[in-house]
């Protein structure tokens, strides 16, 4: 085995900011962290927003953080992936969308767009619908019909009118599209096999059955008058002046379902695409030979084309270490064990050859502010023993405390949590240095740095503040502007391993 040793130490939820009020990171006595910060090259990293594949300004989290760290690149979450594709012009070149549009032009049939009508960004984004309308216009598709699912859950409960008006303005401006049905997500986006709900949405879309209105806004107005708000609006059909539905989904039509989150998109998709569907009677005129497009991969059961296929994360840090014959150890307590294993390996459960894992049980307490040290000392003891035994070249370690205790929004226990972690950090890093190894000390996102809101209430969420990075190697400098995706390349650099082409991050050590 190579005698090289480098460790990646993640202080979970340890963000940096200058203001000390409500900031447990600043208030804690942490002589070891401060000693390393003052002695060794250090910088800050961006751990939120587009730097970790989330929408601009969105706080990071442990899952996303560890995915980015392990992948050595920005791992785009679905919403951001589509946003970036629209911005960069790739969206309008997407072959799956273009094939659907070609299908309806060749067959002389209709294109139906359906999905959640809001900018909540949890299941869908209305801007993705607008991008599809623009693409349909550009491709010369004339018969485009929208089946809008009303939200009221990821956005305010009475906001549907705003989104319908905005959509109507876009339709007018772009010059294509017409609203055909509207239904509350309670019906169209059920995920709990309540098929009576799904059937109502299906029958409105496929058969034009349900309450009928000429003006889409009247659907909402009428519902509100009956005390029924957005999420629960009964699937309703928009009609022409003669009372006929504007459009129903028929044989040989194309559908693009623009929700990106799968769980609530699967049932309604199966209703339209699955030949063996038996959960309710779809009737004699069930639309056949649909060209059905899902924005992302919904499920193996959905028989449709996928516009944004799953991204396989090849050559994550664990795989590269393994390929180079290096021995690695992943260690954390229960709360963050999946993060240093599954998420660090890009969503892979199995170990790589040469990978060892140590799981230390988290304490059995109702909330961790009751035991701020959690299992940090046990993690430290187990790890120091491993370092002494000289069995591993690479160590990936997570101290959970700043995040898990920080979620209490209580300053005093979180200060204690950080002080416990600092004590453990000192023993671990000094043991590594004594073996001639290197440590990278960093974090995956902020949390313990903001525990009080501007109104003086407990702040229990993550933050968008930068996180520290210290590399315990003297005589080098670290570059500015780093991101979490640069940490794996830095670890490989310390071990003298070339980073693979898939890792678009780069070592923080300036050459």
UniProtKB/Swiss-Prot annotation:
It is an enzyme of class 5 (isomerase). It comes from the Bacteria. Binds 2 manganese ions per subunit. The modification Phosphotyrosine is found at residue 36. Pathway: Carbohydrate degradation; glycolysis; pyruvate from D-glyceraldehyde 3-phosphate: step 3/5. One of its GO terms (biological process) is glycolytic process. Its cofactor is Mn(2+). Keywords: Glycolysis, Isomerase, Manganese, Metal-binding, Phosphoprotein, Sporulation. The keyword Nucleotide-binding does not apply. PANTHER family: 2,3-BISPHOSPHOGLYCERATE-INDEPENDENT PHOSPHOGLYCERATE MUTASE. This is 2,3-bisphosphoglycerate-independent phosphoglycerate mutase. It comes from Bacillus licheniformis (strain ATCC 14580 / DSM 13 / JCM 2505 / CCUG 7422 / NBRC 12200 / NCIMB 9375 / NCTC 10341 / NRRL NRS-1264 / Gibson 46).
